[in-house]
């Protein structure tokens, strides 16, 4: 029994499903626009096994900090396969990254000032730069990322990347957070309008992330609108570029930066029911596990109860709650069905923003396991006290 060896709470990683998702998404876009690739969003789930698989499958690493950049390098990703986005960058690490051949998408004019110094200090090195672009897509949000394409600052950076001898202008990039399909044609058309207006077709066009992934029907039903599939995203975006570029001699590489779309259904969380009580007519089961382990709030996650041999009872509108001392730490509201102490609960669709956003709150985090056939691979050991507190002075 896995619990006997690894404890009463752990994550289960599915590396095979991750590879299937990556290839399916990539090939769906390529069927419409062949010169296409994926830059995997490390922030969504930076488990090294996933990152290594992306590199093995020919994808890029999309990082937003020097920490994530270091993850990519330790996973064996070459600098020229790393795309560094993000609003704030450590200037020393950025210099090392650019001199080594990495690609930086510049987010603001202050970052450009830093880059000018780097380029001057390294005249014999080619500095690879992209520009993060911000324009209207009709989603009701004024995005905080990138340059307003109608601003003076945008003109300044465009002039710089075109006129500086040792700077190689790589790409335009954008990122808009809303995942609904109706906003995807607008981000693609906005980019096409930009390159058409400027008369510049870069060697790469990067239209960012913000895609729904695969999920159980019970989870889909809790969203107000339709959950698009890979084909719908591809038709909404890749078709725009295929049509615009069909008569052009240059066919730039098209990139998206998905996270949830490829990793969302590739991790489960397993917890154990420890107590069941009735408080003023409401049944409450406390689990070794927390909402902070699954990072899904406001919805009931896809959940399965596995009887572990103890006595079960039938319950109605029972809440499964976490081990923390927070009233709102509820994993599942109003469960109807059988449940017993020491039963296992398995929560699906935990791949996105779960492991990476679990704080060192109340308890250290649990191990991550990959079950490959009959073999159990430890992807991340369970944390212990010293993992969290060795940086404190006692």
Where are these regions (language model features)?
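Active-site-proximal loop/turn and secondary-structure-junction residues that shape catalytic pockets
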Residues: 44-46, 67-68, 88-90, 108-110, ...
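Residue-level marker for buried hydrophobic side chains located in beta-strands
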Residues: 61-62, 129, 205, 254
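Conserved, mostly hydrophobic/aromatic
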Residues: 18, 43, 65, 97, ...
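Charged (often Lys/Glu-rich) extended helix/loop segments that serve as interaction or gating elements
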Residues: 236-238, 242-245, 249-394
């Amino acid at each position: 029994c896995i619990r006997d060896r690894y404890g009463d709470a752990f994550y289960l990683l599915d590396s095979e499903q991750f590879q299937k998702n990556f290839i399916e998404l990539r090939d769906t876009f390529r069927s419409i626009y062949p010169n296409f690739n994926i830059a995997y969003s490390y922030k969504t789930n930076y488990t090294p096994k996933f990152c290594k698989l992306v590199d093995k499958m020919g994808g890029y690493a999309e990082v937003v900090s020097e920490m994530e950049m270091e993850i990519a390098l330790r996973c064996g990703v070459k600098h020229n396969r790393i795309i560094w986005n993000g609003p704030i960058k450590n200037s020393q690490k950025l210099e090392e990254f650019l001199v080594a051949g990495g690609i930086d998408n510049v987010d603001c004019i202050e970052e450009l000032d830093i880059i000018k110094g780097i380029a001057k200090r390294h005249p014999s090195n080619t500095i690879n730069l992209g520009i993060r672009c911000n324009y209207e897509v009709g989603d009701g949000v004024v995005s905080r990322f990138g340059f307003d394409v109608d601003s003076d600052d945008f003109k300044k950076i465009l002039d710089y990347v075109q006129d500086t001898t040792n700077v190689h202008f790589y790409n335009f990039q954008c990122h808009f957070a809303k995942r609904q399909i109706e906003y995807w044609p607008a981000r693609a058309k906005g980019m096409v309008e930009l390159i058409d207006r400027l008369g510049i077709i870069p060697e790469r066009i990067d239209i960012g992330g913000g895609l729904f992934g695969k999920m159980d029907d019970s989870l889909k039903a809790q969203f107000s609108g339709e959950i698009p599939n890979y084909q719908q995203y591809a038709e909404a975006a890749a078709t725009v570029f295929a049509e615009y570029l069909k008569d052009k001699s240059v066919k730039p590489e098209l990139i998206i930066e998905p996270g949830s779309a490829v990793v969302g259904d590739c991790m489960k969380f397993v917890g154990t029911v420890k107590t069941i009580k009735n408080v003023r007519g409401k049944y409450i089961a406390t689990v070794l596990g927390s909402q902070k382990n699954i990072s899904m709030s406001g919805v009931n996650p896809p959940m399965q109860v596995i009887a572990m041999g103890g006595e079960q009872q039938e319950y109605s509108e029972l809440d499964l709650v976490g081990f923390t001392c927070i009233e709102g730490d509820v994993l599942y509201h109003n469960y109807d069905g059988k449940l017993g102490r020491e039963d296992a609960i398995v929560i699906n669709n935990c791949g996105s923003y779960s492991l990476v956003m679990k704080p060192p709150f109340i308890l250290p985090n649990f191990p991550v396991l990959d079950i490959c056939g009959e073999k159990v691979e430890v992807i991340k050991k369970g944390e212990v006290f010293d993992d969290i507190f060795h940086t404190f002075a006692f």
